[in-house]
UniProtKB/Swiss-Prot annotation:
Recorded superkingdom: Bacteria
Official protein name in the record: UPF0251 protein Csac_0224
Record-linked Gene3D superfamilies: Winged helix-like DNA-binding domain superfamily/Winged helix DNA-binding domain
PANTHER family, per database record: PTHR37478, UPF0251 PROTEIN TK0562
UniProt family annotation: Belongs to the UPF0251 family.
Amino acid sequence: MPRPIRCRRVEFLPKFKYFSPAQGTSDEVTLKIEELEAIRLKDLEGLMQEECAQKMQVSRQTFQLILEEARKKIADALVHGKAIRIEGGNYVYGKCSYICLNCGKVFDSDYHECPECHSKDIGCTRGRGRCYCFGHGRR
């Protein structure tokens, strides 16, 4: 059984969610919210990959995979004249609060371990200890 996908933290939700070529097309690609966030952090903000991964609360490898997929979709749309729809994904908007499953302390998500007892056994308070935020970001 595969591991559940952790939510990716995003700090930006787009106002415009659909872009199409001047000559209408029925073909489109769907860019997930976390893919747009990866593009924003790396290409627009100019952050290093490690900083981007920390902001999104994913590993560097996962961040790289998200970024590659986003760039591939955007290139496909531009080269082949497809529309881009931005929606969906597994993400949480803003900051989650986390709880230490060892001592029960609730703290900000910027920590990777409990600031009280230094346990790494932590989870998102939205998921009752574990972060299974599937669809939290769907609007």
